[in-house]
C-alpha cells in the first residue's frame, strides 16, 4: 500500500518546506523505501517559466522539458531521483485543463465548480502513477490561510477521507520564534496556524517546528495539548549551518521514526546515512578555499541561482575546498572597470539570463577572464556573451551582437527557429508565445575527442538540460575558430553549437546548456568539479 505524507506550512512563508520534504525523503530512502516527491503550487501561472526570477527564484528544468518550481531541484539533489512534469502542478495548469475540457464538452453541460471539479483534478494529479512507491511526499506551496491554497487543502482533506485508514499523514511545518525580551520560544503562532488548518478539516499528525534553539519539554507538552498531537510528534527542526546537515538533524530529532510510527510500521532497518555524514564532514572541514565571482543579472535574490550555488558547493566537496561566492551585478561593469572587483578572485562564472540589461557587463567580465587567464565558466547566456566578446575582440567583428537585443548587421547570436528533438523537428517563430516555447529539457551533444571538456566528462557523448531561445550562429564558426575559440561540442547533427573553449587558456569554457541542474552532492557535475579544480590552481598563482 502506498502511503501519503502531505507537507503544509504555517505562520510565515519560506520556512523550507521543500528542504524538509527532500530531507524526509532522503531519510526514508536511506531505510530502503521507494519514495516519490511532488509539489502543488497554488499560483495562477501555468508554470513558473515566465515568472521573474527575482520574485520566484530559479526555474528548475526537468529532463522531459518541464519548467518547474525550484523545490524540485532540492528533491533531485537529496534523493538522486529525476523529477518530471508529472511531479509539479499549479492552479493555472489545473484551471487550464478544466477549461479546455469544458470548451470541448467533456463535462456534458455540468456547472463547473471548485468542488468537485477543481478538487477532483487536484486529487487525480496527486494519486496518479504511484503504485510503485512506498511513500509519496506531497508539498503544498504557500502558507495555511492563503486564499489561493484553499482548493488544494480541500483536495488533500478529501484524500485523507477517501484513502484506506492509516495511509495518510499530515505534517505541518511551522515556526517557533524566540522573543529575547521574554527569553522564550513562543508557541502561540503555531497554535493559531494549527487552528486555521483544523478549521478547514485537517488535523496535523506531526508538527515540524523551525527554531534556533532546543524546545523545552514544557513547550512540547503545551504544543501537544493545544494542537492535539502526541508529544512525541512535536519534532524539533533546528537551524543548521548547511542544508546538507538537515537530514541528519531530522534523524536525530526522530522525524523518520515518528512517520513510521504514525503508519504503524516497524522499522525494517536503521537508515544508512554514511554518505550524508561524509558530505557533511567535507563541507564543515575543507582543506582550503577559493572565491568565485558570479556576474549575474538577478543577484538581488540568491534563489534565482539556487541550483548554480549548490553545484558550486558540490564542486567544492569534490575538491575538498570551501567555495566562497562574490556576487556582482552585471550592470556595474557597464559603467565601471571590472578589475577592482575581480582582482584576486580565483574564477569567474557568468550564468544564464534574458534580455539586454547587463549584457555588456557580462561581455566585459568574459574579456577580463580571457585576457588574464582566469578560469571562466559561461552558462547559456554566459556562453553567448563570451562568443560575442571573442567575435569583437579577436575576430574584429565590431558590430557582433545578439538579435535578442534588436536588429544587428552581425548576428553572432540569433533566434533559434528549428531544432531536432529526437527524430522530430520542432519550430519556433519570433511571434511565438513566451511560455513553454524555448528549447527545453534534455538533449544529447557530441564533444570533440581531444577537447578539454571531453576530458572532464570522460567521453564524447553527453546529455544535458537546456532552457534557451537564442543560439550561437554557426555561420561564424570558421572565423572564430581561426582566432582560437573552438566549437568543442555540437548537437548530434552538427547544426547547433553546444560548447566552446578558448585554446591556450587554462580553463575557459562556455556551454549552452545548464549543467547545474544535474549536479548532486554525491555526484558533483564534472564541469563544476573541473571549474573548482582550475580555481584551486589559480589560487596558487594569486
UniProtKB/Swiss-Prot annotation:
Q: Where does CTP bind?
A: 13, 146-148, 186-191, 222
Domain of life per record: Bacteria
Protein activity control: Allosterically activated by GTP, when glutamine is the substrate; GTP has no effect on the reaction when ammonia is the substrate. The allosteric effector GTP functions by stabilizing the protein conformation that binds the tetrahedral intermediate(s) formed during glutamine hydrolysis. Inhibited by the product CTP, via allosteric rather than competitive inhibition.
Keyword terms:
ATP-binding, Glutamine amidotransferase, Ligase, Magnesium, Metal-binding, Nucleotide-binding, Pyrimidine biosynthesis
Q: Which InterPro entries match?
A: Class_I_gatase-like, CTP_synthase, CTP_synthase_N, GATASE, GATase1_CTP_Synthase, P-loop_NTPase
Record-listed UTP binding positions: 13, 186-191, 222
Residues where L-glutamine binds: 353, 381-384, 404, 469
List the record's Gene Ontology CC terms alphabetically: cytosol
* Miscellaneous comment in the UniProt entry for this protein: CTPSs have evolved a hybrid strategy for distinguishing between UTP and CTP. The overlapping regions of the product feedback inhibitory and substrate sites recognize a common feature in both compounds, the triphosphate moiety. To differentiate isosteric substrate and product pyrimidine rings, an additional pocket far from the expected kinase/ligase catalytic site, specifically recognizes the cytosine and ribose portions of the product inhibitor.
Query: Which NCBIfam families does the record cross-reference, listed alphabetically?
Result: PRK05380.1, PyrG
Q: What is this protein called?
A: CTP synthase
Organism whose genome encodes this protein: Methylorubrum extorquens (strain CM4 / NCIMB 13688)
